[in-house]
């Protein structure tokens, strides 16, 4: 991963929690193409549940809540917006916070929900619906579609009683089972040495709470990246969620497995580096593990609640540079190695193992990808 992210501005608004960030990007597909592009792996569609429907508080409804990243350039006068359609209803449009962005940066925004869509536009529809991310420019007289997709809406009853006036209090959510078989391997910069000593990261999805995760990396059958000092492990690898797609209202787990929540987990290995070109001698804890000096197949095994739950295998070529060609050919918008993820055990509950074939990236499935058996 050669992108260098540095936050330059952030804006947080209430209710829809509109988060906007302008960051640097060293290499961008948009720069090569001369126009803005959407990073497909950044698009996250959720359902915002309204506590009314057509003026009645006896029935809940929903509207889309989306966040995504745009690789620049975004020209002066450019305005991002989303248009969505549910069967039997006219299209609805809502604007997203937008800022002029040069080609070497990207812009991230979250929009929709209560702040972007009037409550009277709420719907009780469930099933697939279409949406598009667009950019209009009143100054240039242009209107361009940047991304089109489909998301599947489902519902589950709220954690209230299920009778009387509460009978139609359903909470809506987007099904993200398609994410589970798809993982990513990439590097991030070292805080001090930058790309001279990049850190290994592996990302994957779980259905449920991304807590109590313990990652272990293996090479030729032996665990690597563990450094002990005076009987204590230092620089221990860790996992945490960086994306959580969940409901906006409380639901009971007995009604919705894992409470209809999907979390993207990033496991970072501080002791494992793509290479070390810093020229520094090893410190007091010893040398860091270098992938470029140990090419071949690696396997990440992850314990979740003390049970083996994930296996991710990937190859590192000589020199340590990851093969991001699959991401490039599918115009993912982010330079990452895409890898299959093996789901082990039953902690994710029952999930659709074939969803990735048609639903991945909201109806834009990967070409050239095969899920793990």
Features from the language model and the residues they span:
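Bacterial N-terminal signal peptides that target proteins for export
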Residues: 2-12
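Intrinsic disorder/low-complexity segments in short proteins, especially the signal peptide
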Residues: 6, 16-18, 27
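Bacterial N-terminal signal peptides
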Residues: 11-21
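Signal peptide processing junction and immediate N-terminal pro/mature segment
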Residues: 22-32
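Contiguous segments within soluble domain cores/interaction surfaces
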Residues: 32-145, 172-302, 310-312, 318, ...
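Extracellular interdomain linker/stem segments of modular secreted and single-pass surface proteins
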Residues: 152-159, 317-323
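Disulfide-bonded cysteine-rich modules in secreted/extracellular proteins
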Residues: 156-171
